[in-house]
From Swiss-Prot:
Predominant location category: cytoplasm
Record-level GO cellular component terms: cytoplasm
UniProt GO BP: arginine biosynthetic process via ornithine; citrulline biosynthetic process; L-arginine biosynthetic process
Protein name: Ornithine carbamoyltransferase
Pathway recorded for this protein: Amino-acid biosynthesis; L-arginine biosynthesis; L-arginine from L-ornithine and carbamoyl phosphate: step 1/3
Gene: argF
Source species: Neisseria sicca
Catalysed reactions, semicolon-separated: carbamoyl phosphate + L-ornithine = L-citrulline + phosphate + H(+)
Site (Important for structural integrity): 79
Length: 232
């Protein structure tokens, strides 16, 4: 939209990390482009690209973090909360091991926000990420709560976030395990009401399995009897 020249390299169009090292790919692309956005799996890949490219490298998504989504989420929360971010509280409920929960935890800590994670303890962010976030929050005045009680997590918040329970590339067999673990962490009207805030708002990075209008949504309904998964 801004008139830039953009090239999209889909996975099958690049030999990065396969027939060509990440370092070599970074050096070549860095000579051809003014910036690189990487959207893939390993955090170590985008960090190595940034180390050798010689141009700005943007993390469009990895398994561990989703910083560009955080820019959008921070802007959205600022626009719709009616108060400064350091006076805003939000919760993330669901599978908290991956990029969205990790990134929201770090984002909230850096911005001095009140951050709650509601998830089974086995699905919490790694101890390393939690420790880093707590250290940052001590400097910014942020608050961090990790709990296995979804209603405790959402009490008094301005926003409730969630994400899919089974990520792209995971086998269908993962659904049964996640549903068993996370059925009490679905974002439902009742959970929204449990916040005690009539103005609470729901956020999801999308796509969301919230009804039967997709092939996956219909399969989940036929297999598990759920009309919507992480959110209804």
């Amino acid at each position: 939209d801004q008139g830039a020249g953009v090239t999209y390299l889909e996975p099958s169009a690049s030999q990065i990390g396969h027939k060509e090292s990440i370092k070599d790919t970074a050096r070549v692309l860095g000579r051809m482009y003014d910036g690189i956005e990487y959207r893939g799996f390993g955090q170590e890949v985008v960090e190595e690209l940034a180390k050798y490219a010689g141009v700005p490298v943007f993390n469009g998504l990895t398994n561990e973090f989703h910083p560009t989504q955080m820019l959008a989420d921070a802007l959205t929360m600022r626009e719709h909360s009616g108060k400064p971010l350091n006076q805003t509280a939000f919760a993330y409920v669901g599978d908290a091991r991956y990029n969205m929960a990790n990134s929201l935890l770090v984002l909230g800590a850096k911005l001095g926000m009140d951050v709650r994670i509601g998830a089974p303890k086995t699905l919490w962010p790694s101890e390393n990420i939690v420790a880093r976030a707590r250290a940052v929050a001590e400097e910014t005045g942020g608050k961090i709560l990790l709990t296995e009680n979804a209603e405790e997590a959402v009490k008094g918040v301005d926003f409730i976030h969630t994400d899919v329970w089974v990520s792209m590339g995971e086998p269908k067999e993962a659904w049964q395990e996640r549903i068993d673990l996370l059925k009490d962490y679905r974002v439902t009207p009742e959970l929204m009401e449990a916040s005690g805030n009539p103005q609470v708002k729901f956020m999801h990075c999308l796509p969301a399995f919230h009804n039967r209008e997709t092939k996956v949504g219909e399969w989940i309904y036929e297999t598990f009897g759920l009309n919507g998964v992480e959110v209804t």
